[in-house]
C-alpha cells in the first residue's frame, strides 16, 4: 500500500512540474484569492446575508478582474471567498464599490466592525492549482479547509496540492470547483463547491482526499484528524459571481 501511495505521489509531482503538456493545471496560473469569515453582529444575521446577496450583481458589473466571488453562510458567520486574475485585480476589489459599501455598513452588520470584524479576518493567498468551475450556479454548498504544514514540510505539501487540481478534474465530476491555495510560507487551504452534500461526501472519499490523508501524518501539523478534519468548515452558498 505504501509503495502504491509513493508511486502515485511521484506521478503527482511529475504532473506538477510538466506544465507544458498538462494544460488543465494552468487554468488559474498566477491567480490570487481571498477568504474572509465575518461574525454577524447581534440580531443582524439576516440583514448581513441580504447585504451579501445584493452585492453579487455589483461585483459582476464593476469588477471584471474578480474571476469568482462567493457569499457564504455558516450559522452566524458570513464569509466571502473570491478569486482574482492577478494581484492587481485583488487590489482593485478591495478598493471597489462592494468593499466600500461593506466598510460603510460594517459597524451595524459585523461583530467588531470594519477593522476587527472584516480586515482582521482577511486571508489572502496565491492559487496553486484548480479544477475549473463547471455548472457553477448549481452549487449550493462549499467547504473551506485551512491546513498548516508540518515543520520542514511546506514544500512537499505545496507539491502535493499543486498536483491535485488535475486529479480532481479527472476523477470528481461532482466537485464543481476546487482550488488549492498557499497563504504564506507554512499555511495552505482548499476551497471547493458542490451541488449538494452527496457531492461533498464523494469528494472526501475520493483520490485526492485519500492521498492527503495518507500523507497527513508526515506533511500536516496535527496530522489528518487535528490538522485537516478539525479545520473543515462547511458553508451554504448565498450568491455567486
Q: What is each of the regions a protein language model found here?
A:
Residues 38-50, 147-159:
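Short, surface-exposed ligand-recognition loops at beta-strand->loop->(often short) alpha-helix junctions
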Residues 1-9:
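Bacterial N-terminal signal peptides that target proteins for export
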Residues 121-147:
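Surface-exposed beta-loop interaction hotspot
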Residues 19-23:
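Sec/Tat signal peptide C-region and signal peptidase I cleavage site
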Residues 54-70, 83-121, 167-177, 193-232:
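An amphipathic, aromatic/His-enriched active-site/gating alpha helix that lines ligand/cofactor pockets
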Residues 9-17:
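Bacterial N-terminal signal peptides
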Residues 31-39, 79, 140-148:
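Active-site-flanking beta-strand signature of metal-NTP-handling nucleotidyl enzymes
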Amino acid at each position: 500500500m505504501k509503495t502504491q501511495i509513493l508511486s502515485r505521489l511521484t506521478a503527482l509531482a511529475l504532473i506538477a512540474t510538466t506544465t507544458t503538456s498538462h494544460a488543465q493545471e494552468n487554468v488559474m496560473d498566477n491567480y490570487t484569492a481571498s477568504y474572509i469569515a465575518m461574525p454577524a453582529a447581534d440580531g443582524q444575521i439576516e440583514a448581513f446575508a441580504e447585504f451579501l446577496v445584493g452585492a453579487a450583481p455589483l461585483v459582476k458589473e464593476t469588477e471584471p478582474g474578480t474571476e469568482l466571488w462567493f457569499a457564504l453562510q455558516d450559522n452566524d458567520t458570513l464569509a466571502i471567498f473570491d478569486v482574482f486574475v492577478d494581484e492587481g485585480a485583488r487590489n482593485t476589489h478591495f478598493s471597489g464599490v462592494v468593499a466600500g459599501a461593506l466598510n460603510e455598513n460594517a459597524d451595524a452588520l459585523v461583530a467588531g466592525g470594519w477593522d476587527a470584524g472584516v480586515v482582521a479576518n482577511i486571508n489572502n493567498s496565491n492559487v496553486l492549482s484548480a479544477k475549473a468551475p463547471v455548472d457553477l450556479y448549481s452549487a449550493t454548498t462549499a467547504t473551506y479547509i485551512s491546513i498548516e504544514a508540518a515543520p520542514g514540510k511546506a514544500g512537499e505539501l505545496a507539491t502535493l496540492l499543486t498536483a491535485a487540481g488535475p486529479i480532481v478534474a479527472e476523477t470528481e465530476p461532482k466537485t464543481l470547483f476546487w482550488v488549492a491555495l498557499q497563504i504564506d510560507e507554512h499555511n495552505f487551504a482548499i476551497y471547493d463547491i458542490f451541488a449538494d452534500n452527496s457531492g461533498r461526501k464523494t469528494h472526501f472519499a475520493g483520490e485526492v482526499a485519500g492521498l492527503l490523508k495518507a500523507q497527513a501524518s508526515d506533511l500536516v501539523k496535527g496530522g489528518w484528524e487535528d490538522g485537516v478534519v478539525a479545520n473543515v468548515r462547511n458553508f451554504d452558498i448565498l450568491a455567486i459571481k
